Curated annotation (Swiss-Prot):
The lineage of its organism: Bacteria, Bacillati, Bacillota, Clostridia, Thermoanaerobacterales. Required for maturation of 30S ribosomal subunits. Belongs to the RimP family. This is Ribosome maturation factor RimP. The gene is rimP. HAMAP family: RimP (MF_01077). CDD domains: YlxS_C. The keyword Cytoplasm applies. It holds the Pfam family RimP_N. GO terms for biological process: ribosomal small subunit assembly; translation. GO terms for cellular component: cytosol. It is found in: Cytoplasm.
Amino acid sequence: MSKIEQIAKDLVMPILEKNNFELVDVEYKKEGSHWYLRVYIDKEGGITLDDCQLVSEYLSDRLDEVDPIEHSYILEVSSPGLDRPLKKPRDFERNIGKEIEISLYTPIDKRKKFEGELIEFTGDKIIILYNGERKEFDMKNVSLVKPVIKF
């Protein structure tokens, strides 16, 4: 986490805690000629537009007071979306029993992607039901995990 991301995280936590929101992620990056500070939040039942506005206004005021960013940037506060990557233990716990897609750094059985039902997460390992059998993946070899969205 960069210094700017850490400052934004520290500044936004009071409003999140007050409203029982979860901080999913903070990212500060340049896209094209613009810098973006993005804050992704969530809560039980899902985040609303009003929730995002509340957090955005609060964080904008705090950032103006501290002024940690020397150049212009765009502040965005949003929900992480349905297909957000699973990163924290809580993300995995919420998705037990659901279909996930796992991408690997190093292939297993000549494959780098697996899809199956998440049946267990231990912190070090992800265990899915893949083609009717338990399959374990070491987190050190996992590059990305995200839910499978079916409509």
